[in-house]
């Protein structure tokens, strides 16, 4: 039985320009009103996830930095990773690609569990340097940025740890996402929903694919879960 919903933010509850989609917010609040805690899961910074949690009104823990940080509305935080070899990678990348840029959240010192690079450099290039230097890192393209992190840091492990706070198992969670970095979440949860614009690799692992993209798809996914598991009448 599904007892909680975890959901990605960018591209899943937003418009393509990253503005919050009203239907998605309403669907999240409906789930919360029905007693289903919602966990926001994002590759973005903990500050971003905390603010979204407060403004949207979710009661579940938030999972930020691609699973590297778990937090709650009281702003308590648990760090599951650190920067590791990230700055070694960054130094080498800048030598070879001087136009490479970190995300703005890196510039402002908001991140603690990994490096985020703007998509001006192909993810294959980043992975190649990691392999060449034998660094203990992985690189994942979320569709919005390239996330470089320690191998144990991912959305799936973040969900596992967040579930302990809720007193449930990951198998009692339904996850909704739209990016390659949602694959690890799909591996641990009990039900998987991919939003329509998600890459094929994610859709192949989904139990359900929405007909609508972006925030409309996120809203559709939540309603689908609520109906499938008996929280709403069909």
UniProtKB/Swiss-Prot annotation:
- Keyword RNA-binding attributed: no
Give the E.C. number(s): 3.1.3.18
Keyword Metal-binding assigned: yes
* Cofactor(s) needed: Mg(2+)
Residues noted as binding substrate in the record, renumbered to the chain: 155
- Active site residues according to the UniProt entry: 8
* SUPFAM superfamilies found in the cross-reference section: HAD-like
Q: Name one GO molecular function term.
A: phosphoglycolate phosphatase activity
- Give the matching HAMAP family: GPH_hydrolase_arch (MF_01419)
Q: What is this protein called?
A: Phosphoglycolate phosphatase
Q: Which organism is it from?
A: Thermococcus sibiricus (strain DSM 12597 / MM 739)
Which lineage is the organism of this entry classified under, starting from the top rank?
Archaea, Methanobacteriati, Methanobacteriota, Thermococci, Thermococcales
């Amino acid at each position: 039985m599904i007892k909680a919903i975890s959901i990605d933010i960018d591209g899943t509850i937003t418009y393509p320009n990253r503005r919050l989609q009203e239907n998605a917010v309403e669907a999240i609040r409906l789930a919360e009103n029905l007693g289903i805690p919602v966990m926001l899961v994002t590759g973005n910074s903990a500050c971003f996830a905390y603010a979204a949690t407060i403004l949207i009104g979710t009661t579940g823990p938030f999972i930020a930095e691609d699973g590297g940080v778990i937090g709650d509305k009281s702003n308590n935080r648990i760090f599951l990773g650190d920067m590791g070899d990230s700055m070694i990678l960054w130094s080498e990348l800048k030598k070879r690609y001087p136009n490479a840029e970190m995300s703005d959240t890196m510039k402002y010192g908001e991140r603690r569990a990994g490096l985020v690079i703007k998509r001006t450099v192909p993810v294959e290039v980043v992975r190649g340097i990691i392999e060449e230097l034998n660094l203990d890192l992985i690189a994942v393209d979320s569709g919005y940025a390239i996330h470089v992190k320690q191998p144990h840091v991912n959305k799936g492990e973040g969900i596992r740890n967040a579930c302990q706070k809720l007193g449930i198992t990951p198998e009692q969670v339904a996850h909704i996402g739209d990016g390659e970095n949602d694959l690890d979440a799909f591996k641990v949860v009990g039900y998987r929903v991919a939003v329509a614009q998600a890459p094929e690799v994610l859709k192949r692992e989904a139990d359900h694919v929405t007909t609508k993209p972006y925030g409309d798809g996120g809203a559709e996914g939540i309603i689908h879960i609520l109906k499938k598991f008996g929280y709403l009448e069909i």
